[in-house]
Amino acid sequence: MSDMYTKHAKRYDAVAQSNIYNALLERPSTIALLSPLSEKTVLDMGCGSGIYAQYFLTQNVNYLTCIDASSEMIELVKAKHGSNVNAYVQDLSQGLPQEPDNLYDAIICPLVLHYLEDLPALFQEAYRVLKKGGYMVFSMHHPFADFECSVTGNYYEREQIEEEWDTVGEPVTVRFYRRSLTEITEALNAAGFVISRLTEGVVAKEAKQISPETYERLSRNPNFIFIRCEK
């Protein structure tokens, strides 16, 4: 796991509240795929510092579980939301061993899956814990956007990419997996999911006032992909 989400957890939380990529592109594009959540059971899978949890609690959810591999992030969630959420540390590469079958109406998994090598295993676990008629919404790096980082030059070959990001104000090493759209959709199909929506998101116009250059780039080039799939 990158130091971004452990050592720099508090700084990442502060930045993610309002930066263009999270607040003005990823979150509104993900939320647009959700059905009304009032009285629903929700699993925030890869919850980070609890920014989505804050939104869910305003929607009058019946029960909210927040899990993340970073203990530092989970501590932030507990500090913010206390007993309003069931928050605990869980490495998603190990599945969802603490979660029972058929519990959740909705699962959200924002900007997490590109850090995991084995998508089929996690999708099978997500399918297991969803109620019949439930759904999962997730966002991840767009396959096209990541291909420019490819070392092999083979779009269809999964590969691990290493970059340095300055999200928290200093360079931090981040490693993630680049994979084809086919690999993503086939893993969903194999788990039993049916894809009902697939979008590339829309950057909010407010971003233009913050950084015209970034707004222009995100308006012309895909950065994330957003998928809703049904059980």
PLM features per residue range, with description:
Residues 43-45, 49-96:
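Class I SAM-dependent methyltransferase SAM/SAH-binding core
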Residues 175-199:
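Short alpha-helix
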Residues 120-135:
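A short glycine-rich, Lys/Arg-flanked "PGG" loop and its adjoining helix->strand segment in the class I
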Residues 1-37, 51-55, 73-76, 80, 136-164:
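Conserved class I S-adenosyl-L-methionine
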